[in-house]
Structures are given as C-alpha cells and as structure tokens.
Amino acid sequence: MGCCSSRSADSPASRVTRWRSTGIVALRDARLKVVPNEVLQVGNSLRILDLTNNKIAEIPQEVGTLVNMQRLVLAGNLVESIPANIGYLRNLKILTLDRNKISVLPEELGSLSNLQQLSISQNSLSRLPKSVGDLRNMLLLNVSDNKLIALPESIGGCSSLEELQANGNSIEDVPSSICNLVCLKSLSLNGNKIRQLPQNLLKDCKALQNISLHDNPISMDQFQQMDGFTEFEARRRKKFDKQIDSNVMMSSTALDEGIDLN
C-alpha cells in the first residue's frame, strides 16, 4: 500500500494538481528531451516554468496557451528557434534563453509588453528583431556571446532599459538611437569591433554610470573627447567613491569599466 501510495503521489495527474496549486514548475537537470505534456496541462495556473539544463530541442507551439506565465527559463538546452506563439505571453516578465542554439528571434517577441528581463547570451543570433524596440518595460537585455554585427536602430524604443550587455559579438556600429535610452545605467560592449560611439551618448544618457568597452578598436582619446565625458566621469567616480580607491579605479593600462589605452 505504501509503495502504491508513493507511485500515486508522483503520478502525472498528481504533479499537474501540485503545479496548479503552486503555479511553479521546476524541472532543472531532469534529462528532458521534450517539454512534458503535463506542463502544458497546468494552463492558466502556471506562473513560473524552469527547464534549465535539459536537452530540449524544441519549444512546443502550445506554450502560447500559458498566458499567465511570468517567468520562463530555458537556459542550457538545445533550442534552435522560438515559436511565434510566444507573443501571446503578455504577462511574461523574465525570459531566460542563455546557452542554446538560437539563431533568430521572432518579430512576435515585441508583443511581450510586460517583459522586464531578456537574457539570450551564448547563442547564435546574427541579428535582433526590429520589434525589440517595442519592449518598453524591459530593464535588462543580455545578448552577449552571439554573432551580432549590429544593434537595431529600433533599440532606442526600449525607454525603460537600465542595463545592456552585448559582449563578445562582432558589433561595429552602435546606433544613434541608443542616445534615447535615458534610463540606461550600464552599457557593456567588451570584445566587439567598435571604433566609435554616438557623439551624444554620454551627454544624452544622463543616468549612465558604467561603460565597458575593453577589447575594441576605439581609443581612450576618442572616448574622452565625447560630449558629456566630464559629467559621465563624475557620475562614475561618485558611484565607486566608497568602494574602490582611485589607484585601482584608474590603472596604468586601462580605465576600469572603460576603454583600453590603445
């Protein structure tokens, strides 16, 4: 009886009941190759779905029916594409897709009007959809370690963006529209091919406290001659005033959180 009771407690039906009760499905490191059918049966009750570190290659179209989901984590899988139906997840706040094989994102991504964090580092993206500019509530965008050669001009529409990470790509130009990101606090573009930044970036992005551009062709002289550099440097020093002394902050080889001395 005890054995049968144990099996019953972990039956698909009982799991669905439990997941509906909590709103949370956590299946990390479960050796899954597909998204279990029971997950989709949770329906409108599902708020958090974590499928980190499995071997899932495909996200089913039915994921679009999970309309109350707020957090979707699929990091460390084998996903190659995102279904257009993801655009139905209007309550989604956090989407984590790091360490997959994704080469393109659907334009429907821009329909995620409540999205606050999008992390899709270590994939194979060659471009971002134009609709990324429709994500006006997004606070964090991480597209590091992809194959991007540019950021879309539409990124200037991400009016709430506070942190942009795009390290380890092949980006050559930063669009002038980035100057519209008045909430931007941190911009990290290490390991790209950037030779210059929009002239008004430091002047217009008055919240900016941290720029990291190591391993790029841009020179320290170019950076220091940008409009608004003095004010930016004052903000940066104020941020670290109580944490790091000036000898560490300004080393002999680089401006920490800045640009290599070429």
Curated annotation (Swiss-Prot):
Which residues form the LRR repeats? 19-42, 43-66, 68-89, 90-112, 113-135, 137-158, 159-181, 182-204, 206-231
User: Which keywords does the record carry?
Assistant: Leucine-rich repeat, Repeat
Q: Which GO terms describe its biological process?
A: intracellular signal transduction
- PROSITE patterns listed in its UniProt record: LRR (PS51450)
Q: What do mutants without this gene show?
A: No visible phenotype.
Functionally, this protein is described as follows: Leucine-rich repeat protein that likely mediates protein interactions, possibly in the context of signal transduction.
Name of the molecule in the record? Plant intracellular Ras-group-related LRR protein 7
Species: Oryza sativa subsp. japonica
Q: What gene name is listed for this protein? A: IRL7
